[in-house]
Structures are given as structure tokens and as C-alpha cells.
Amino acid sequence: MIKNSLVAFVFGTLCAFSSFAQELNCTVEVNSSSVEGTSTEVFRSLQQSMSEYLNEQQWTNTVFSPNERIECRMFLTVKEYKDDKVKGELQVQLSRPVYNSSYTTTLLNFKDTKVEFNYRDGDRLVFNENSWEDNLTGILNYYAYLFLAMDFDSFSPNGGQPYYDKAAGVVQMAQSSGEIGWRTFEDNRNRSAVLSSFTDSNTGMIRDLLYQYHRKGLDEMVTSADKGRAAITESLKALEKIYDNAPMSVALTMFRDSKLDELVNVYSKAPQSEREEVFELLKKLYPTDLERINKIRTPEE
């Protein structure tokens, strides 16, 4: 009886520990509505496999409690499925809670248009950190590490460095595989370019922005709106530096797609001089988004 109780206790403890190990809470959705003549079962299987792979894998040595898991989303739109090969687009989103509030802020909202991989119904996805398995697990590994890197950066200065390094390892292996979406000079919005926007010295100040904007800015606004907003205003100056160094950097696009609408709310109660300052900064960077940016200068009543 004592032995059985001890076994039950140890097993329960191990189960409890494993439930604390996973870092990601990632919602995965696969949309195959544009594909005809293929059973939807393969796409249901793909969705489940992707979800289990991301959410059940232990990606770090850091212990996360359930309420600390990183919220992310992946929406795969399948454009073509032929000879077990999937071609499509992947929308990835990453969010984080703001301290002492119910508000959740978006860290990343990015569409990857260069997604191709082989998948058959029931294929098992195998994690291997040190060697290349296939393009699907490579893509999932890359975004898992990018999610971790950006999340850690938003809480501490350069806190995400180990995970940018891991993402770089994935990119290096992928480039040897010959798969699309990874090559350095393929285009300025692929996975290699996205990673470089965080690690290249010309654009790496986007990482400082992640910390200043979120930890010193949004997290502080709950207790002092003026102090937090001032930190956000200061953080935006990093965008000017990026623009001056690399005006076509995907870092600028990623910031726009995740933050422009939020900034309208951030500055809704700011002094007019502060709103004007931010408006002037952003209109230089995003001249085609003046209608949205103008709402910062002239908030709707």
C-alpha cells in the first residue's frame, strides 16, 4: 500500500511538472477551402499535428506555469495540395499580457507567403534541434524560437538572445536544404530577412524598442499613463534609426502591422504636442498609412 502510494505520488509529481514545462499556448488553424478534390481529413490531421508539436514540445529550460504560457496563433491557408506537397501562406501572431490589466498587446502579426512542405495524413512530426528533419518542422521550430525571443525581449533587455541564436541555427540548416523562404537574398520579407531584422546591427534596435515599448511603456501605463506613454514615445525613435539605415526593412512593416492601431488608443488622451510629435515621426515612415496615422493627431470623439 505504501509502495503504491509512493508510486502514485511520484507519477503525479512528474505529471504536474510536465504540465509546467511547455512554453507555448498556440492556436493553430488550417484553412483548405480553396483546395478541391482532396479529403479534408489530411488537413484536419495537419492542424492537429502542428498544434501538438508546438504546444507539447519543451522549447526552453525555463519553467512556465500554465498562466505564463506564451499566447500565439498560426493560420495556414492552403493554396495548393498536390503529390503530398502543401503550398500556402502562414499568418503568425504573437501577443503578451500587460501587467496589472486585462489588456493583451500584439507583438507580432506577420504573413509568411513562402510556405511549402510535404505532408501526408498521419505523418509524425519529429523534433530535432541539431539536424534538419523537414521543412514543416523547420518552419515550426523557427517561429517557436522567434515567439520566445520576442516575448523574452519584451520583458528584459536582450532577454531573447538565446532564442534568436536557436532561430539562426534553424535558418542555417534550412538554407542548406534548398527549400524556399530561407535564402538570404530571396526577398526582403522571408524568414531569413525577418530574423536579420532583429540581429543585424542596422536594424537590431527593434529589440530595444520591444523592451522600452512594452516593459517601460505599456506595463507602466496602468500606474502612470503619462510616464508609460513618454517611454513609448521615446521608444519609437528606434524606428527612425531603422528607417535611416534600412528603409525597406521588414522590421518597419512588422511594427506597422502589429502596432499602428494600438498607438491610436495609446495617444487618445495625450497632450496635443505629444500627439503631433508621434504623428510627424510615423508619417515619414508610413506615408501610405496617413489615414490611420492621422487618428493619432486627431483622435475621434
Predicted regions, residues:
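Bacterial Sec-dependent N-terminal signal peptides
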Residues: 1-23
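A cross-kingdom marker for long, charged
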Residues: 29, 217-301
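Flexible, glycine-rich surface segments
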Residues: 159-252
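Acidic/His-rich structured neighborhood in mature extracellular/periplasmic domains
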Residues: 84-196
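Start-of-domain marker
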Residues: 22-87, 98-100
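Sec-exported extracytoplasmic/periplasmic mature domains
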Residues: 51-59, 149-153, 264, 268
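Second-shell loop/turn segments in exported
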Residues: 33-40, 126-134, 244-245
